[in-house]
A protein has these predicted regions:
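Structural signature of extracellular appendage/secretion-system components
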Residues: 1-473
């Protein structure tokens, strides 16, 4: 009778083990689409078998085993960081490309071409009032184009500053979730597949925002580092980041927009540690591309160089000429010359100039009635040293800036496409190891159900034998 009840107990243990295994499989199916979830594998542990000691063997359910591979997780995070970087660059640069219309139909290039054409028309009819009025009108259009372009660039900088700030806030928020995980780990308790899934989903989101390194410690906690160096979370302490704008060197240009920086909890500049993720892409455009166009404390920017060169050379040529009344010419353009970054945003037509004070005559010798107007008409393509910017004609320099921006945008877009493919491949490789296959789980459930049914039948048989024996007593 004792052996019968021992077999009943062994069968009950096996039944419970199969039940627990079925629950694990069901949990896998339920979380097949849960972000960060790794497939759990049920375990069955053999019980000791020794008839002399009354140990009849059997099985019991063990703790489910996770199939997560941290090496593969690290690979996904790395590729996700690269994608975030190139994606942020591509999106930001795509917003800047319309500023420089390569067709020459709009923007600075169109206005500049129109001004030079008005000079050409004026040179053909130097005494024409209509031609002179057209010169003044086209000069006003050019000033407005420069101001509009600088306004768009300034708005782009503001937008990126806001995105940098929101990204830093998101990083701090996600880091606080890692901190919460560490606090729970310190409290002990069994492994939690849901908590583990949330942690790895958080780490992947952090990688998309910035290049982070996650180190799993022996006590179960996670150490989080920015760029492998700057601590974000260590144990049960969080170190928050902040975004600030300031210049690190002595400013050469007054009234320039300061550089964007990332500062750690101790106030140290850790911008150099931001090497991937959305934050890196935003910083690249904010601190490199935009200053190259609108200038900063150390450089005037391409747009200001063009505005200053056009204004200075036009004014110099007009000042060297004579009006129809024999008076010296006056400047066509005004701009704020107190800082190299102010030329384009302040470029306007001299309010004192009129059609009568436009000087087309070159006093020579020899005197040429339309000499100044002709020189102005050819200014855009002139290779003379005083007419060039960095060795290029004004129009060639502007076209070059347009091409540079277009190439930067195309490169970022191409890199984004490659990075997206790499992320997809890394995720697919991870899914092969730790992803949930519904077909595989269906087969496992069928196998476990058969085992469960067998144990149920065994228990039913033992119960029947026990009842029979009890009736015989």
């Amino acid at each position: 009778m004792g052996t019968l009840f021992a077999n009943l107990n062994s069968s009950a243990n096996a039944l419970a083990a199969f039940q627990r295994s079925l629950e694990v499989a069901q949990n896998n199916v339920s979380n097949a689409s849960t972000a960060g979830y790794a497939k759990q594998v049920p375990t069955l542990n053999a019980l000791p078998f020794n008839l002399q000691s009354g140990l009849l063997g059997g099985v019991q359910s063990g703790a489910p085993q996770s199939t997560r591979d941290e090496f593969l997780e690290q690979g996904v995070r790395y590729q996700t960081g690269l994608l975030g970087n190139f994606q942020a660059q591509a999106q930001s640069l795509a917003g800047l490309e319309p500023i420089f219309d390569v067709t020459g139909q709009t923007g600075i290039l169109a206005s500049l071409n129109s001004l030079f054409q008005s000079f050409s028309n004026w040179s053909a009819s130097p005494d024409s009032v209509a031609a002179r009025q057209d010169v003044l009108a086209k000069a006003q259009d050019l000033g407005a184009s420069f101001q509009q372009t600088m306004s768009v660039l300034s708005s782009a900088s503001d937008s990126i500053d806001n995105k940098i700030g929101s990204t830093v806030s998101e990083i701090n928020s996600l880091a606080s979730q890692v901190l919460d995980y560490n606090v729970r780990q310190a409290g002990g308790g069994p492994a939690d597949a849901g908590l583990d899934a949330h942690l790895h989903d958080t780490l992947e989101s952090l990688s998309s925002d910035a290049g982070i390194t996650a180190r799993f410690e022996s006590d179960g906690s996670v150490t989080l580092l920015l760029g492998g160096q700057t601590p974000l979370v260590i144990g049960q302490r969080q170190y928050s980041l902040s975004a600030e704008n300031f210049d690190t060197g002595t400013p050469v240009n007054a009234n320039a927009r300061p550089t964007a920086h990332i500062v750690d909890a101790s106030g140290q500049d850790v911008t150099a540690n931001v090497t991937s993720g959305t934050l890196a892409g935003l910083l690249a455009v904010r601190n490199s591309v935009l200053p190259g166009l609108q200038g900063d404390s150390q450089q005037p920017g391409a747009i200001n160089l063009i505005a200053k060169k056009v204004a200075d050379r036009v004014n110099q040529l007009l000042a060297s000429g004579l009006t129809p009344g024999g008076l010296a010419g006056v400047a066509l353009f005004n701009y704020d010359g107190t800082s190299a970054v102010m030329a384009a945003r302040t470029l306007t037509v001299n309010p004192s100039i009129t059609t009568d004070t436009l000087a087309a005559l070159d006093p020579g010798p020899p005197q040429v009635a339309n000499g100044i107007a002709m020189a102005l008409a050819g200014l855009g393509q002139s290779k003379a040293g005083t007419d060039t910017i960095n060795g290029q004609s004004i129009q060639d320099f502007l076209n070059g800036q347009t091409q540079i921006l277009g190439q930067q945008s195309a490169t970022a877009t191409a890199n984004q496409s490659v990075a997206q493919q790499a992320v997809t491949q890394a995720q697919a490789l991870r899914a092969q190891v730790s992803g949930v296959s519904l077909d595989e789980e269906a087969i496992r459930v069928m196998e476990l159900q058969r085992g469960y049914q067998s144990m149920s039948k065994m228990i039913s048989v033992i119960n029947g034998l026990a009842d029979t024996l009890m009736q015989m007593v």
